[in-house]
């Protein structure tokens, strides 16, 4: 979404606009969709673990207004107490233009150079989201998106794994759970959902429909 207002407008409609229908045909979207399985496969080999590609959308039990779409989920990992743990793995293709928003030298893993040390935990740093994202070397948008997925799986950390379009190199960033940011996201989502519910008509049909053209 380009803005919160765009999100609210979409959630208050029960049809798809022409622009929304055309999103899937855009080259950048198709590229990401078609290369995603390759990136998942490569990261699975690196991790030595299966990376699942969920096909369903999930809703949080305690906060039903929060939904999750997972690009990838790392399987067969365990916490220190022996409990089973899923780890979110956000998957992206980065265009030549988008490369400027990433710092590969801060990646926990790069295909040509291998592994680096896991980064420090920045949750308690007295800085904003943009600064925290910069400490990891990733865009702020994907920092918050990954935190939401970490929240959805109740995970202690997550990965942002990308392929650079320029050289097809895989980079993966290890990102710790940031409960302060997660709390902010929950509050913002709650406020936004209240606006949506107040704007929707009483008989709103939750089923998304394609708008028909009668002209």
Regions found by a protein language model. Name each.
Residues 1-215:
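Accessory terminal regions of nucleic-acid processing enzymes
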């Amino acid at each position: 979404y380009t803005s919160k207002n765009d999100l609210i407008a979409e959630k208050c409609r029960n049809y798809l606009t022409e622009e929304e229908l055309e999103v899937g045909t855009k080259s950048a979207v198709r590229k990401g969709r078609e290369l995603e399985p390759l990136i998942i496969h490569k990261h699975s080999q690196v991790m030595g673990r299966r990376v699942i590609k969920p096909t369903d959308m999930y809703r949080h039990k305690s906060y039903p207004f929060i939904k999750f779409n997972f690009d990838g989920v790392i399987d067969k990992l365990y916490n220190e107490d022996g409990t089973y743990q899923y780890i979110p793995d956000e998957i992206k293709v980065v265009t030549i233009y988008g490369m400027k928003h990433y710092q590969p030298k801060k990646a926990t893993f790069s295909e040509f150079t291998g592994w680096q040390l896991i980064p420090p935990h920045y949750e308690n740093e007295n800085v904003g989201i943009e600064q925290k994202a910069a400490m990891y070397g990733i865009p702020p948008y994907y920092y918050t998106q990954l935190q939401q997925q970490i929240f959805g799986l109740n995970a202690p950390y997550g990965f942002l794994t990308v392929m650079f379009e320029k050289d097809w190199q895989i980079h993966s960033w290890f990102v710790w759970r940031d409960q302060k940011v997660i709390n902010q996201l929950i509050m913002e989502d709650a406020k936004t959902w209240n606006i949506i519910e107040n704007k929707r008509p009483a008989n709103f049909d939750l089923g998304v429909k394609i708008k028909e053209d009668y002209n």
